């Protein structure tokens, strides 16, 4: 099935809480994950909550990477949404799993913007759809 985007939603469990509460570490890890996925970084925003926790997003030309952390539980919710067929979202997630020391990861994958459901002829598409199996 052809789609415009590929989204992976991941739950990271048993992470190193000190990394999840460090806004600079989280920012650097997310930017490196975007680079490892071959994304073109446009901008980023991250916020450290008091007393702990970080939320942030890296906006990339191909869509986004987002994270919300709960260091007190060793947990992070990660979202990688990419468009096109040269981006490697799995590479981003594998890097983040290692960076945060996740002991367990649960993922759910979705195809976003299913071309067949749009009723738009392939030759009229402005974005090259990812070929998601």
UniProtKB/Swiss-Prot annotation:
Catalytic activity: S-adenosyl-L-methionine + H(+) = S-adenosyl 3-(methylsulfanyl)propylamine + CO2
Gene3D superfamilies: 3.30.160.750, S-adenosylmethionine decarboxylase domain (3.30.360.110)
Keywords per UniProt: Autocatalytic cleavage, Decarboxylase, Lyase, Polyamine biosynthesis, Pyruvate, S-adenosyl-L-methionine, Schiff base, Spermidine biosynthesis, Zymogen
Single annotated GO MF: adenosylmethionine decarboxylase activity
Enzyme class: lyase
Regions crossing the membrane: none
Free-text remark on how the cofactor is bound: Binds 1 pyruvoyl group covalently per subunit.
Cofactor needs: pyruvate
Cross-referenced SUPFAM superfamilies: S-adenosylmethionine decarboxylase
EC number(s) per entry: 4.1.1.50
Free-text function comment from the UniProt entry: Catalyzes the decarboxylation of S-adenosylmethionine to S-adenosylmethioninamine (dcAdoMet), the propylamine donor required for the synthesis of the polyamines spermine and spermidine from the diamine putrescine.
Similarity field: Belongs to the prokaryotic AdoMetDC family. Type 1 subfamily.
Protein name according to UniProt: S-adenosylmethionine decarboxylase proenzyme
Chain's gene name: speH
């Amino acid at each position: 099935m052809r789609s415009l985007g590929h989204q992976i939603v991941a739950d990271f469990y048993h992470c190193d809480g000190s990394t999840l509460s460090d806004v600079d570490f989280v920012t650097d890890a997310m930017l490196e994950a975007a680079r490892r996925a071959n994304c073109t970084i446009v901008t980023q925003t991250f916020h450290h909550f008091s007393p702990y926790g970080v939320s942030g997003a890296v906006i990339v030309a191909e869509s986004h990477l987002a994270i919300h952390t709960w260091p007190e539980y060793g947990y992070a919710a990660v979202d990688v949404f990419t468009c096109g067929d040269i981006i490697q979202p799995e590479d981003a997630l594998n890097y983040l799993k290692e960076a945060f020391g996740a002991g367990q990861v649960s993922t759910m994958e979705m195809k976003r913007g299913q071309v067949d459901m749009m009723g738009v002829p392939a030759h009229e598409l402005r974005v090259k759809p990812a070929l998601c199996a």
